[in-house]
Amino acid sequence: MTAPAKQIVIITGMSGSGKSTAIRALEDSGFFCIDNLPVLLLPKLTELAGGGHFERMALVVDVREGVFLKDAPRILAEVRRAGHQVEVLFLDASDDSLIRRFSETRRRHPLAPNGTVAEGIKAERQALRDLRELADQVIDSSTLNVHDLKRMVQARFSPEPAAGPSLSIMSFGYRYGVPPQADLVLDVRFLPNPYFVPEMKGLTGKVPKVAAYVLEREETQQFLEKVVDLCRFLFPRYQKEGKAYLTVALGCTGGKHRSVAIAAELTQRLTDEDTRVQLWDRDIEKE
Protein backbone atom coordinates (compact mmCIF):
# COMPACT_ATOMS: atom_id res chain seq x y z
CA MET A 1 0.00 0.00 0.00
CA THR A 2 1.42 3.39 -1.01
CA ALA A 3 2.11 5.79 1.85
CA PRO A 4 0.13 9.04 1.72
CA ALA A 5 1.88 12.02 0.15
CA LYS A 6 3.29 14.51 2.62
CA GLN A 7 3.54 18.29 2.61
CA ILE A 8 7.19 19.11 3.21
CA VAL A 9 8.44 22.67 3.65
CA ILE A 10 12.18 23.22 3.37
CA ILE A 11 13.22 26.42 5.13
CA THR A 12 16.56 27.75 4.04
CA GLY A 13 18.30 31.07 3.64
CA MET A 14 20.79 33.46 5.12
CA SER A 15 21.97 33.28 8.72
CA GLY A 16 20.10 35.94 10.66
CA SER A 17 17.23 36.17 8.18
CA GLY A 18 14.62 34.55 10.44
CA LYS A 19 14.74 30.80 9.82
CA SER A 20 14.20 30.05 13.52
CA THR A 21 11.14 32.29 13.56
CA ALA A 22 9.81 30.58 10.44
CA ILE A 23 10.22 27.06 11.80
CA ARG A 24 8.52 28.04 15.07
CA ALA A 25 5.65 29.57 13.09
CA LEU A 26 5.10 26.29 11.25
CA GLU A 27 5.41 24.29 14.46
CA ASP A 28 2.64 26.46 15.93
CA SER A 29 0.59 25.66 12.81
CA GLY A 30 0.79 21.92 13.39
CA PHE A 31 3.84 20.96 11.34
CA PHE A 32 6.30 18.36 12.60
CA CYS A 33 9.51 20.38 12.61
CA ILE A 34 13.21 19.48 12.60
CA ASP A 35 15.97 22.06 12.74
CA ASN A 36 19.21 21.17 10.96
CA LEU A 37 18.33 17.73 9.62
CA PRO A 38 21.06 16.62 7.18
CA VAL A 39 19.41 16.81 3.78
CA LEU A 40 20.73 13.36 2.89
CA LEU A 41 18.39 11.91 5.53
CA LEU A 42 15.23 13.45 4.07
CA PRO A 43 14.24 10.43 1.92
CA LYS A 44 14.74 8.14 4.92
CA LEU A 45 12.66 10.45 7.11
CA THR A 46 9.73 10.38 4.69
CA GLU A 47 9.99 6.59 4.61
CA LEU A 48 10.05 6.26 8.41
CA ALA A 49 7.15 8.71 8.73
CA GLY A 50 4.95 6.58 6.48
CA GLY A 51 1.30 5.84 7.07
CA GLY A 52 -0.65 8.73 8.50
CA HIS A 53 2.17 10.05 10.70
CA PHE A 54 3.60 13.55 10.24
CA GLU A 55 1.64 14.48 7.13
CA ARG A 56 3.01 18.04 7.32
CA MET A 57 6.72 18.44 7.97
CA ALA A 58 9.07 21.43 8.00
CA LEU A 59 12.85 21.21 7.95
CA VAL A 60 15.65 23.76 8.14
CA VAL A 61 18.45 23.28 5.61
CA ASP A 62 21.27 25.82 5.69
CA VAL A 63 25.04 26.31 5.51
CA ARG A 64 25.53 23.99 8.48
CA GLU A 65 25.08 21.21 5.90
CA GLY A 66 28.64 21.91 4.77
CA VAL A 67 29.77 19.74 1.87
CA PHE A 68 26.36 18.01 1.73
CA LEU A 69 24.62 21.24 0.70
CA LYS A 70 25.44 20.56 -2.93
CA ASP A 71 23.31 17.40 -2.75
CA ALA A 72 20.15 19.31 -1.80
CA PRO A 73 18.77 19.81 -5.36
CA ARG A 74 19.16 16.10 -6.14
CA ILE A 75 17.60 15.00 -2.85
CA LEU A 76 14.62 17.34 -3.21
CA ALA A 77 13.99 16.07 -6.74
CA GLU A 78 14.10 12.49 -5.43
CA VAL A 79 11.52 13.22 -2.73
CA ARG A 80 9.25 14.95 -5.24
CA ARG A 81 9.46 11.94 -7.55
CA ALA A 82 8.25 9.83 -4.63
CA GLY A 83 5.01 11.83 -4.80
CA HIS A 84 5.50 14.26 -1.92
CA GLN A 85 4.68 17.96 -2.11
CA VAL A 86 7.96 19.75 -1.44
CA GLU A 87 8.14 23.54 -1.22
CA VAL A 88 11.31 25.55 -0.63
CA LEU A 89 11.07 28.79 1.33
CA PHE A 90 14.20 30.94 1.14
CA LEU A 91 14.61 33.68 3.74
CA ASP A 92 16.82 36.61 2.84
CA ALA A 93 17.64 40.10 4.07
CA SER A 94 19.86 42.95 3.00
CA ASP A 95 23.52 42.81 4.01
CA ASP A 96 23.05 45.87 6.23
CA SER A 97 20.12 44.23 8.03
CA LEU A 98 22.04 41.00 8.58
CA ILE A 99 25.12 42.83 9.86
CA ARG A 100 22.96 44.83 12.27
CA ARG A 101 21.27 41.68 13.58
CA PHE A 102 24.60 39.94 14.16
CA SER A 103 25.83 43.03 15.97
CA GLU A 104 22.75 43.15 18.19
CA THR A 105 23.06 39.48 19.18
CA ARG A 106 26.89 39.57 19.32
CA ARG A 107 27.05 36.31 17.40
CA ARG A 108 29.78 35.31 14.99
CA HIS A 109 28.87 34.37 11.46
CA PRO A 110 29.10 30.57 11.00
CA LEU A 111 31.17 30.94 7.84
CA ALA A 112 33.54 33.54 9.28
CA PRO A 113 34.28 32.63 12.91
CA ASN A 114 37.56 34.52 12.77
CA GLY A 115 36.64 37.08 10.13
CA THR A 116 34.08 39.83 9.70
CA VAL A 117 30.33 39.31 9.44
CA ALA A 118 30.41 40.91 5.99
CA GLU A 119 32.89 38.27 4.82
CA GLY A 120 30.66 35.52 6.19
CA ILE A 121 27.60 36.93 4.44
CA LYS A 122 29.42 37.08 1.12
CA ALA A 123 30.56 33.45 1.45
CA GLU A 124 27.10 32.31 2.50
CA ARG A 125 25.37 33.97 -0.46
CA GLN A 126 27.72 32.10 -2.76
CA ALA A 127 27.17 28.78 -0.95
CA LEU A 128 23.37 29.11 -1.07
CA ARG A 129 23.13 30.39 -4.63
CA ASP A 130 21.89 27.11 -6.17
CA LEU A 131 19.42 26.49 -3.35
CA ARG A 132 17.99 30.00 -3.73
CA GLU A 133 17.29 29.32 -7.39
CA LEU A 134 15.17 26.32 -6.34
CA ALA A 135 13.00 28.39 -4.00
CA ASP A 136 9.25 28.42 -4.53
CA GLN A 137 9.12 31.63 -2.52
CA VAL A 138 11.68 34.15 -1.28
CA ILE A 139 10.83 36.35 1.70
CA ASP A 140 13.01 39.38 2.37
CA SER A 141 12.81 39.99 6.11
CA SER A 142 14.79 43.25 6.09
CA THR A 143 11.79 45.37 7.10
CA LEU A 144 9.87 42.69 9.03
CA ASN A 145 9.71 42.13 12.76
CA VAL A 146 9.31 38.60 14.15
CA HIS A 147 5.52 38.97 14.39
CA ASP A 148 5.21 40.09 10.75
CA LEU A 149 7.41 37.23 9.57
CA LYS A 150 5.50 34.66 11.59
CA ARG A 151 2.19 35.93 10.17
CA MET A 152 3.51 35.77 6.60
CA VAL A 153 4.85 32.23 6.95
CA GLN A 154 1.66 30.93 8.56
CA ALA A 155 -0.49 32.59 5.89
CA ARG A 156 1.66 31.12 3.13
CA PHE A 157 1.41 27.55 4.40
CA SER A 158 -2.14 27.56 5.71
CA PRO A 159 -3.70 24.09 5.48
CA GLU A 160 -6.92 25.48 4.01
CA PRO A 161 -7.34 24.06 0.51
CA ALA A 162 -7.73 26.25 -2.53
CA ALA A 163 -8.04 25.21 -6.14
CA GLY A 164 -6.50 28.45 -7.36
CA PRO A 165 -3.57 30.52 -6.16
CA SER A 166 -3.00 31.75 -2.64
CA LEU A 167 -3.01 35.53 -2.62
CA SER A 168 -1.66 38.00 -0.10
CA ILE A 169 -3.01 41.55 -0.28
CA MET A 170 -0.78 43.99 1.58
CA SER A 171 -1.21 47.66 2.39
CA PHE A 172 1.93 49.67 3.11
CA GLY A 173 3.31 53.19 3.45
CA TYR A 174 5.92 54.43 1.00
CA ARG A 175 7.67 56.33 3.80
CA TYR A 176 8.58 52.93 5.30
CA GLY A 177 9.79 51.42 2.04
CA VAL A 178 8.32 49.24 -0.69
CA PRO A 179 7.86 45.62 0.51
CA PRO A 180 10.57 43.61 -1.29
CA GLN A 181 8.49 40.42 -1.28
CA ALA A 182 5.72 41.97 -3.40
CA ASP A 183 5.06 40.53 -6.85
CA LEU A 184 2.87 43.48 -7.88
CA VAL A 185 3.09 47.00 -6.41
CA LEU A 186 0.25 49.48 -6.98
CA ASP A 187 0.43 53.13 -5.94
CA VAL A 188 -2.87 54.57 -4.65
CA ARG A 189 -1.51 58.01 -3.78
CA PHE A 190 -3.50 59.46 -6.70
CA LEU A 191 -6.61 59.26 -4.49
CA PRO A 192 -7.62 62.10 -2.10
CA ASN A 193 -5.98 61.62 1.29
CA PRO A 194 -8.24 61.37 4.39
CA TYR A 195 -5.21 62.39 6.46
CA PHE A 196 -5.94 66.00 5.54
CA VAL A 197 -9.53 65.80 6.78
CA PRO A 198 -9.22 66.82 10.47
CA GLU A 199 -11.77 64.36 11.85
CA MET A 200 -10.15 61.48 9.91
CA LYS A 201 -6.47 62.24 10.46
CA GLY A 202 -6.09 60.02 13.51
CA LEU A 203 -8.21 57.17 12.13
CA THR A 204 -7.42 54.38 9.68
CA GLY A 205 -8.93 52.96 6.52
CA LYS A 206 -10.65 50.29 8.60
CA VAL A 207 -13.04 52.88 10.06
CA PRO A 208 -16.25 52.93 7.94
CA LYS A 209 -16.34 56.69 7.34
CA VAL A 210 -12.70 56.72 6.23
CA ALA A 211 -13.26 53.73 3.96
CA ALA A 212 -16.33 55.43 2.49
CA TYR A 213 -14.33 58.62 1.86
CA VAL A 214 -11.83 56.60 -0.18
CA LEU A 215 -14.15 54.10 -1.86
CA GLU A 216 -17.16 56.23 -2.80
CA ARG A 217 -15.36 57.94 -5.65
CA GLU A 218 -15.70 57.14 -9.30
CA GLU A 219 -11.95 56.96 -9.85
CA THR A 220 -11.62 54.51 -6.95
CA GLN A 221 -14.26 52.21 -8.38
CA GLN A 222 -12.65 52.35 -11.82
CA PHE A 223 -9.27 51.57 -10.28
CA LEU A 224 -10.63 48.59 -8.34
CA GLU A 225 -12.35 47.17 -11.40
CA LYS A 226 -9.14 47.39 -13.42
CA VAL A 227 -7.05 45.82 -10.64
CA VAL A 228 -9.50 42.93 -10.22
CA ASP A 229 -9.45 42.36 -13.98
CA LEU A 230 -5.63 42.45 -13.98
CA CYS A 231 -5.37 39.98 -11.11
CA ARG A 232 -7.83 37.55 -12.64
CA PHE A 233 -5.95 37.78 -15.93
CA LEU A 234 -2.59 37.13 -14.27
CA PHE A 235 -3.51 34.39 -11.78
CA PRO A 236 -3.97 31.48 -14.21
CA ARG A 237 -0.87 32.52 -16.14
CA TYR A 238 1.22 32.62 -12.97
CA GLN A 239 -0.14 29.19 -12.05
CA LYS A 240 0.79 27.84 -15.46
CA GLU A 241 4.38 28.88 -14.74
CA GLY A 242 4.30 27.09 -11.39
CA LYS A 243 3.82 30.13 -9.15
CA ALA A 244 0.99 29.35 -6.73
CA TYR A 245 1.44 32.26 -4.31
CA LEU A 246 1.21 35.97 -5.14
CA THR A 247 1.67 39.11 -3.11
CA VAL A 248 -0.06 42.30 -4.29
CA ALA A 249 1.04 45.41 -2.40
CA LEU A 250 -0.95 48.66 -2.35
CA GLY A 251 0.88 51.73 -1.13
CA CYS A 252 -0.05 55.19 0.06
CA THR A 253 2.04 57.74 1.94
CA GLY A 254 1.80 56.41 5.49
CA GLY A 255 0.03 53.08 5.05
CA LYS A 256 -2.92 53.98 7.30
CA HIS A 257 -5.77 55.38 5.21
CA ARG A 258 -6.03 54.94 1.43
CA SER A 259 -4.04 51.73 1.01
CA VAL A 260 -5.81 50.10 3.98
CA ALA A 261 -9.27 50.84 2.60
CA ILE A 262 -8.35 49.74 -0.93
CA ALA A 263 -6.66 46.55 0.30
CA ALA A 264 -9.73 45.53 2.32
CA GLU A 265 -12.06 46.13 -0.62
CA LEU A 266 -9.77 44.31 -3.04
CA THR A 267 -9.58 41.35 -0.65
CA GLN A 268 -13.36 41.14 -0.56
CA ARG A 269 -13.67 41.29 -4.34
CA LEU A 270 -11.00 38.66 -5.05
CA THR A 271 -11.97 36.11 -2.41
CA ASP A 272 -13.92 33.16 -3.80
CA GLU A 273 -13.99 29.38 -3.49
CA ASP A 274 -10.99 29.03 -5.79
CA THR A 275 -8.73 31.70 -4.29
CA ARG A 276 -7.49 31.96 -0.70
CA VAL A 277 -6.76 35.59 0.18
CA GLN A 278 -4.78 36.83 3.18
CA LEU A 279 -4.96 40.53 4.11
CA TRP A 280 -2.02 42.21 5.86
CA ASP A 281 -1.84 45.90 6.79
CA ARG A 282 1.91 46.23 7.25
CA ASP A 283 2.24 49.79 8.52
CA ILE A 284 -1.15 50.54 10.05
CA GLU A 285 0.23 50.60 13.61
CA LYS A 286 3.35 52.63 12.90
CA GLU A 287 3.67 56.18 14.13
From Swiss-Prot:
Keywords, ordered alphabetically: ATP-binding, GTP-binding, Nucleotide-binding
Pfam families tied to this protein: PapZ_C, RapZ-like_N
Binding site for ATP: 13-20
InterPro entries: P-loop_NTPase (IPR027417), RapZ-like (IPR005337), RapZ-like_N (IPR053930), RapZ_C (IPR053931)
Methyltransferase in keyword set: no
Residues annotated for GTP binding in this entry: 62-65
Assigned protein family: Belongs to the RapZ-like family.
NCBIfam families, alphabetized: PRK05416.1 (NF003828)
Name of this protein: Nucleotide-binding protein MXAN_6564
Lineage of source species: Bacteria, Pseudomonadati, Myxococcota, Myxococcia, Myxococcales
